Amino acid sequence: APFAGFGGNATKVYKGEASAPFIPSVFAVYKKDKWAFSGNFAVTGGGGKATFNEGLGSFESLVSVVPGMLVAAGNEMVDKGVLPINIFNGTNKYSVDSYMRGKQMIFGLQLGATYRITDYLSAFAGVRMNYVSNGYEGHIRNIEANIGGGEMVNVNKYFSDYAKQARTAADAYLAANDLANYAKYDAIAKEATKVAGLTADKELDCDQTGWGVTPILGLDFKMNKWNIGVKYEFNTKLNVENKTRIDNTGLFANGVNTPHDIPALLTVGVSYEILPVLRASVGYHHFFDTNARMADAKDPVTGQTMGKQHFIKQGTNEYLGGIEWDVCKWAQVSAGMQRTKYGVGDNYQSDMSFAVSSYSYGFGAGFDIAKNLKLNVAYFWTDYDKYTKETPNYGGTGIAGKDVFTRTNKVFGIGLDYKF
């Protein structure tokens, strides 16, 4: 396994560390007669920020085949009579300085109005302005290998120097009209230049921004002990534009626009008052992911490139349940859980963007600390599934490989409700 050439382990773990100590949100509503006007600002989507101090598997996989590539190139030059022996035999180790930091965040400013049609039925209409802010910064530097089984050396420098020496010799043989030796050293120079280019340092520093508007409609029905709410958010057409400062990877050309739609969302919630102090609720969310335009991905079987939405079998489904208990006049406690089920296929998943199904569990409490002021606190954690993706041609290396995606998430929240 190529990864064993760096640290001795065929399987490697790439851990992205993320920390968001403070994510603010603000919500306000003003009621007058049958009307209520509301607004809020919050981080409404995105995967947050993550730093991979050892890079990503898709990056290192290309470096891991360097020892084998050198041995194979040496064998080819021996077969062609360019080299008398394979001077690269014994190359079986490599090292690399790899790093990646990324962020994906969607900020939303929502405004809307609610009208009470009857004593039991209210309707809502609103819009949300979404601003997407993505960023990617990373590098692959100082690729080294134990060429010929010797000490670790910088591969780019080694072959750059090797190419210069071979080119000098080729030019000298050409001047002497020794075409046989010229052809030999010309081939060596070209091959060495190729390897030097493949092992050169790579840098990336790119931001992506874009915006779009989401229309929102909702209905709320309340009678006796029942309360039912339905909301539909329309699909948001949105592109993000690359603002690239450095990119010699060829992946993020400056000025290129990439589809980044926010999928339509249908939510349904039902609550029931079991006792005057005890309420239970259930909910369902469905994201229409297959109708949203997304960035391209390649089908490894057909080689065809198309939007990632074509690799989604079905939209995301979420199932929720919770219960709230009024412990006394000034305190409440609650608990709930959520099951999130994605319908993505292998071609959707990559180590730069992946989705794994999960269970979330949460607990909360509310305290009336003043006549018009309530303090809310909550804690929840998410237990993610593991998604395994097996590839016959891992990272374009020609070698079979496997990725296992998962993550962890823990959140503490605090909020204040003020009535005036």
Task: Enumerate the language-model features and the residues they cover.
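A contiguous strand-loop segment
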Residues: 15, 25-29
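Surface-exposed strand-loop-strand hairpins of Gram-negative outer-membrane beta-barrel proteins
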Residues: 1-19
